[in-house]
UniProtKB/Swiss-Prot annotation:
Essential cofactor(s): Mg(2+); Mn(2+)
Catalysed conversion reaction: isopentenyl diphosphate = dimethylallyl diphosphate
Family: Belongs to the IPP isomerase type 1 family.
Chain's role: Catalyzes the 1,3-allylic rearrangement of the homoallylic substrate isopentenyl (IPP) to its highly electrophilic allylic isomer, dimethylallyl diphosphate (DMAPP).
Keyword line: Cytoplasm, Isomerase, Isoprene biosynthesis, Magnesium, Manganese, Metal-binding
The protein's name: Isopentenyl-diphosphate Delta-isomerase
Cellular compartment(s): Cytoplasm
Residues the record lists as binding Mn(2+): H27, H34, H71, E116, E118
Molecular function as annotated in GO: isopentenyl-diphosphate delta-isomerase activity; metal ion binding
Recorded superkingdom: Bacteria
Length: 190
């Protein structure tokens, strides 16, 4: 039985699609700009789900991050991709999915030299079912109050993904400024 190759959408600097490439080939030291997404999932009490990336992940293994991220397949609707990835990574059904940062873009290099270079719209959603993460994706998870997450990220940014440290000041500007995290949003994204 042939193995399925996951493709990502390659973009030019204006965000226009210029092609596709196998996901396994785009996260390198010369990562091409590509399309992704991030999602911040909340529970009924308003707590945010943070996940610790599995140690086996290629990029930023073992660091804490937002609820989940992913890449839409070519010609896949972005909302469908968010729902698909929530189920695949966290065994989670979402409701009230909302686009909150449509133009988020960043470029970052991890300790191994692997580069993330993404136009990465950010979504917010509410969990409709319990979390049941896949261990190859998520090492552990916690539901936390956003007001507690922000100072944790500000004091130990090395323990969190760079995209989360850049997204939080944009999502919670007042809390981030108070915690000293607001300056992270000023870091050039590309």
């Amino acid at each position: 039985m042939p193995q399925h190759t996951e493709l990502v959408v390659l973009l030019d600097d204006d965000g226009e699609t210029i092609g596709t490439a196998p996901k396994a080939t785009v996260h390198t030291r010369d990562t091409a700009l590509h399309l992704a997404f991030s999602c911040h999932v909340f529970d009924a009490e308003g707590r945010i789900l943070v996940t610790r990336r599995a140690i086996g992940k290629l990029t930023w293994p073992g660091v804490w991050t937002n609820s989940f991220c992913g890449h839409p397949a070519p010609d896949e609707d972005m909302l469908e991709a968010v729902h698909r990835r929530a189920e695949q990574e966290l065994g989670l059904t979402l409701e009230s999915v909302e686009l909150v940062l449509p133009d988020f873009r960043y470029r970052a290099t991890d300790a191994a030299g692997v580069v993330e270079n993404e136009i990465c719209p950010v979504f917010r959603a509410v969990a409709a079912t319990p979390v049941d993460p896949r261990p190859e994706e998520v090492g552990e998870y916690q539901w936390v109050d956003p007001e507690q997450l922000i100072p944790a990220v500000a004091h130990t940014p090395w323990a969190f993904s760079p995209w989360l440290t850049l997204q939080l000041p944009l999502l919670y500007p007042e809390h981030a400024a108070h915690a000293g995290l607001a300056d992270a949003a000023a870091v050039p994204a590309a």
